Amino acid sequence: MRLLISLPVLIVVLAMALEGPAPAQATPDLSSAFENLPEKLKEFGNTLEDKARAAIEHIKQKEILTKTRTWFSETFGKLKEKLKTTFD
């Protein structure tokens, strides 16, 4: 009984082994790797750009940072006015 079960299993395993790697598992040759390089670099650049924009938007929306930016703007404006009135 064991022999009857193991023979079909052995045949299937041998067929899979002799078939070779699946197309997804095959290693790409060097020329195809260089052909895809510009696409991959562009995709990487776009991803990096999106992440940078999201980080900048996140920083802009933080309340403490908005208050700090407003305070610096107001202080700089007051300093500018004071210097203008002092030297005019």
Swiss-Prot record:
The keyword Secreted applies. GO terms for cellular component: endoplasmic reticulum; high-density lipoprotein particle; very-low-density lipoprotein particle. The gene is APOC1. It holds the Pfam family ApoC-I. Residues 1-26 form the signal peptide. One of its GO terms (molecular function) is phospholipase inhibitor activity. Keywords: Lipid transport, Secreted, Signal, Transport, VLDL. Belongs to the apolipoprotein C1 family. This is Apolipoprotein C-I. Inhibitor of lipoprotein binding to the low density lipoprotein (LDL) receptor, LDL receptor-related protein, and very low density lipoprotein (VLDL) receptor. Associates with high density lipoproteins (HDL) and the triacylglycerol-rich lipoproteins in the plasma and makes up about 10% of the protein of the VLDL and 2% of that of HDL. Appears to interfere directly with fatty acid uptake and is also the major plasma inhibitor of cholesteryl ester transfer protein (CETP). Its main location: secreted. It is found in: Secreted.
